[in-house]
Each structure stands twice: as C-alpha cells, then as structure tokens.
Swiss-Prot record:
Family under the similarity heading: Belongs to the peptidase S10 family.
Keyword Transferase in record: no
EC number: 3.4.16.-
Cited PANTHER family: SERINE CARBOXYPEPTIDASE-LIKE 44 (PTHR11802:SF465), SERINE PROTEASE FAMILY S10 SERINE CARBOXYPEPTIDASE (PTHR11802)
Gene: SCPL44
Designated name of the protein: Serine carboxypeptidase-like 44
InterPro entries listed in its UniProt record: AB_hydrolase_fold, Peptidase_S10, Ser_caboxypep_ser_AS
The species this protein was found in: Arabidopsis thaliana (Mouse-ear cress)
Length: 479
C-alpha cells in the first residue's frame, strides 16, 4: 500500500511539472525545456512565476559551457520583453550579483539558509536572464584550461553563441523585444555584445534577427583615462581627502596613459599622493557606496555560529548580503535545485573568479566609438550612475556621455533636471537626441538596485517601456 501511495505521488509530480512546463497555449513542443525547470529553491517563498536554470554548451569540443538562470516576469510573461543582465569584474557572477543581491526576485536570508522576496525585483517589468560569463565565472566552465585566458572579444563572441543557442531552448523569445543591461565592467561587455548582435543582424537579410531594443549600463567603465581621475575628484568633493592632496593628484598625475593593470608612467609625487589617499580613506569605507557601513566577516560568522541572523543593516541595506549569498549558493541542495555544478568543479562557488587570466589591457579600450555605432543604429542607450559610488563615479560617466552626444551632433532633448520616484527626487537626468540618456540615482551604490531598489525599478521600467523619467514635480512642500 505504501509503495502504491508513493507511485501515485511520483505520477502526480510528473504531471504537475509537465503542465507547468507547457507553453502558454498549452503546447509542450513550443514550451520551455523541462529539464531546466527549477521547481523550487531551498527556503524559497511561494511564487507564481517560473524559474529555469542550466547550461548552454558554447563549444562542445573544448567542453566550454555557460550557466544561466532565467526568471519569468511576475505577470504577463508572454507579452513582456526579455532582459539579459551581465555583471562586470571582469570575472564576477551575474547569478550571485544581479540575480541574488540586486534585481532578481529573491535575496538570501540572514542565516544564509533560505530566501526572502525582493519586492522591487525587475521581473515586475521584464523576463530576466542572468548569465555567468565568460567560462570560469561562477558555475560556467571549460574542460580546456586555455579557455580561461580570455578577453573582451572572445567574451562577446561566446555570448552571441549563447544567446542563439538559448533561444533554441526558449524559441518563443526569438521575436520578443530584447534589452541588454549590466553594470561596472559590463560597460565593456554590454556594448560589445550589442555590437556583435547588430553585426549579426546586418548579415541575416530575411532570416532570424535579434529584436534589440535598447541597452542600459550602470556605473560603467567606459574610458579609463576619464573614469580613473573621476575617482579622486569624487574623494575630494566628498571630503575624503584634503584640498592639498586633491590638487596634488590632479596636477601631478597624468591619467592619459593609465592602464587597467599596471601603474601608468606616474611621477614619484603622484605615486606618493595616490598611496596617501588610500591610507587616509582607510579600508573601513565601502568604496562601492561611501554612505554604507562595512560588513565585518568575523562578526558575521560569529552570529551564524550562534545561530543568529548574520544580517547587518545600514541605511536599510543588508551590508552582509554578499557573505549570505556566498554561503547559500554553496549549499549542495541549492546547486542541485539550480542544476548547477554538473561537473563537480574542484572549487567553491565565489562571486568573482580567481581562475581567469583576463586580458586586462582590454580595460583600456574606449567604449565611446562602439556606443556611437549602437546609437547610430537607432538603438537607445541609457547610462545610469549611483551617486554614492567612488569606484566608477558619475563624474566621469556624465562627461563621457556628453562627449558622445557632442560627437553624434545631438541636441539636448530633455534638459538636465531632477526626476521623481514616489514624490521624492530619484536622481537627475539629461537626454540627447531622443536616443542617449544619462541618469543618476540618488543615494545609490555602484550596484544601483542593491541600495536603491525602488528608484532602480522605476528607472528600469521607464527604460524598457521607452518612457522618459518623470520631471514633473510633486505638490509643493508646506510647513
């Protein structure tokens, strides 16, 4: 009798999974891949949308595969667009970053054993696809060690192959509006992927083409010789270094020949000033958001050992979330639920890879010419900046967007001014030529959705809907 009961339950589960995996028209042949369906993550709250995760083989001979995590839109997924999100680094995980600490539907709980809902998840506005790229990041891997020596060009080509093969798994998205988004070094990843997609489209005549509708990049690395001096301008303007030290750095440091990996040809005075800046600011400042407190790993681990919540809140933000997601994603039951780590990698999951031998000289490349090609193809470009980030501050991004607008001979179509979210200033925005937008997000970190989820969702929703950020002022304040 017991065996019959278990058999009945097994059949019921299979039927449920098959029904859940069917397409919206009930046609399984046109549906999503059953083998990649994530029925439920450990400790996950109940949700109505579906999740999928697994691998896409990029090069079977080399044994190179990229891991993805896909989340349906919360409502009307059949009509909402598809957004690909990429984290930067280079070499950091879009699953650990974008999906589980920023804009995905779940955050880890303070005990690192479960999940809680993110009420401002971007899947309210779009279907979301997160990919760990290149191979060697997160659970993406290669059986050919030389593949871990890589750079921007090969990363973009692999991502093009990934998108083509992922769409074979999910064919109903072939005609869907596609948006590309990311942050930090994705200021290289996203424009270069958009560029190869547009090149691919140009060669396709009447065959399949990507329906690319826009790209959005947050606190992006665009041009190193402008983004680096912006760091020290930020330190000075926020009172983190003295007037004298700020002037010394600005006058003695030639950032024109700065490189991504090595000290540029700097004077002794410049070197001493830069080192002094690091000493004054100290390691106890969160460079990604100077307002937030830092998380002390030893205290976090002590709390967990005492079976307390390891969460530490600062300005309403869990500053220990990166440690929580590290522990959560290394749980065997989590990896099993995500169909991850299928080759039993000989190392733990980590947010940023130590395997990659990335071509860091690629970081010196100027992304403005690529962005110019994208805009000239009538694909809208949004650059957004959390204004508390000192790593890639808004000061550099804003001047670079203006430089790009001037190069395109664009007029200002929306003058620089405040935009509003829930009656409060969400940030400031300017638009050029109806195709190029720069927006700040007030009070936001390098990882904008992490520290300002409501404002980030408002910005993202406006982006995918093709709307301008609202300039309309709220009612006047009264005493």
């Amino acid at each position: 009798m017991v065996g019959g009961k278990w058999r009945f339950l097994e059949v019921a589960v299979v039927v449920m999974v098959l029904q859940w995996s069917c397409d919206y028209n009930g046609n399984l042949a046109e549906g999503f891949p059953v083998q990649d369906l994530v029925t439920k993550l450990p400790g996950q709250p109940e949700v109505a949308f579906r999740q999928f995760a697994g691998y896409v083989d990029i090069d079977v001979k080399a044994g190179r595969s990229l891991f993805y995590y896909f989340v349906e839109a919360e409502k009307q997924p059949h009509s909402k667009p598809l957004t690909l999100w990429l984290n930067g680094g280079p070499g950091c995980s879009s699953i650990g970053g974008g999906a589980f600490t920023e804009l995905g539907p779940f955050y880890p709980t303070g005990d690192a054993r479960g999940l809680r809902r993110n009420p401002k998840s971007w899947n309210k506005a779009s279907n979301l696809l997160f990919v760990d790229s290149p191979a060697g990041v997160g659970w993406s891997y290669s059986n050919t060690t030389s593949d871990y020596t890589t750079g921007d060009e090969s990363t973009a080509k692999d991502m093009l192959v990934f998108m083509l093969r992922w769409l074979e798994k999910f064919p109903q998205f072939k005609t869907r509006n596609l948006f590309l988004a990311g942050e930090s070094y994705a200021g290289h990843y996203v424009p270069q992927l958009a560029d190869v997609i547009l090149e691919y489209n140009a060669q396709r005549s009447n065959r399949f083409k990507f329906n690319l509708k826009g790209i959005a990049i947050g606190n992006p690395l665009l041009k190193l010789d402008r983004d680096v001096p912006a760091i020290y301008e930020f330190f000075w303007s926020h009172g983190m270094i003295s007037d004298e030290l700020g002037l010394t750095i600005m006058n003695q440091c030639d950032f024109e020949d700065y490189t991504f990996t090595d000290s540029h040809n700097i004077s002794k005075l410049c070197e001493a000033a830069v080192n002094q800046a690091g000493t004054i600011i100290t390691q106890y400042v969160n460079y990604y958001d100077i307002l937030l407190d830092v998380c002390y790993p030893s205290l976090f681990e002590q709390e967990l050992r005492l079976k307390k919540m390891g969460t530490r809140m600062s300005f309403g933000v869990d500053v220990c979330m990166s440690f929580e997601e590290q522990l959560y994603l290394n749980l065997p039951e989590v990896q099993k639920a995500l169909h991850a780590n299928r080759t039993k990698l000989p190392y733990e999951w980590s947010m940023c890879s130590s395997l990659l031998n990335y071509k860091y000289t690629d970081g010196n490349a100027n992304m403005l010419p690529i962005l110019k090609r994208i805009v000239k193809s009538k694909v809208p470009v949004w650059v957004f900046s959390g204004d508390e980030d000192s790593v890639i501050p808004l000061l550099g991004s804003r001047t670079l967007v203006k430089e790009l607008a001037d190069d395109l001979n664009f007029n200002t179509t929306v003058p620089y001014g405040a935009w509003f979210d829930k009656g409060q200033v969400g940030g400031w925005v300017v638009e050029y030529g109806n195709l190029l937008t720069f927006a700040t997000v007030r009070g936001a970190a390098h990882m904008v959705p992490y520290s300002q989820p409501s404002r980030a969702l408002h910005l993202f929703t406006s982006f995918v809907l093709g709307r301008k950020l609202p300039h309309k002022s709220p009612p006047a304040l009264h005493d």
